[in-house]
Swiss-Prot record:
Domain EngB-type G: 44-217
Residues binding Mg(2+): 59, 81
CC annotations in GO: cytosol
Biological function: Necessary for normal cell division and for the maintenance of normal septation.
Stored InterPro entries: G_ENGB_dom, GTP-bd, GTP-bd_ribosome_bio_YsxC, P-loop_NTPase
Superkingdom per UniProt: Bacteria
List of residues binding GTP: 52-59, 79-83, 97-100, 164-167, 198-200
Gene3D superfamilies, sorted: P-loop containing nucleotide triphosphate hydrolases (3.40.50.300)
Cofactor: Mg(2+)
Source species taxonomy: Bacteria, Pseudomonadati, Pseudomonadota, Alphaproteobacteria, Rhodobacterales
Pfam families to which the protein is assigned, alphabetical: MMR_HSR1
Protein name in UniProt: Probable GTP-binding protein EngB
Amino acid sequence: MTALPFPVAEEPDAFTAETGRKLFAGPSEFVKGVVAMSGLPPADRVEVCFAGRSNVGKSSLINALTGTKGLARASNTPGRTQEINFFTQGPELYLVDLPGYGYANAPLKVVEKWQKLLKQYLSGRQTLRRAFVLIDARHGVKAVDDEIMKLLDTSAVTFQCVLTKADKVKAAERDKVLAQVRAALAKHPAAYPEIVLTSSEKGDGIATLRSIIAHLE
């Protein structure tokens, strides 16, 4: 039987899950919001970033990972908060929340400024180990998602697709979305060959994602 491209990541074994649990058992704190490269905190630890359309559930996922309700705050207005937000997870990890994209109502100058900052950050941050691109399991990959994936390709940043709100779709519909996502990912050389299914509300996939992050060096 031929293996599917971009399989869904399996749940970690007990040892691997414990490594992830220990990492995220430490304190989580907001460090700063950055609007220019000069404001970046010291590149002194492993870093992962989270990208996704507005309302994809990015803040909820970060809060679920850290177990800290309200750590990352959502904005319902695309383009409203044009900052790269840094959070510490213990002494060894930065979680980086990139601004939600989807700019139908955002001024062009705001979009251009954010795109410039994002390109500089992705191409110039040596401690960035992986980007997680969040895709709503109800909708699949949209054109704006494909654009961020292209940017990650050109920046040579490995990215992994995380399907959010997986509990909101039935199995048959989820399989259709997975097929569409796999086809989209196949076009991107920087795509990591595994997909993570998550539900921040129910906690599904959180241990898996914690373990993945814990094993990045």
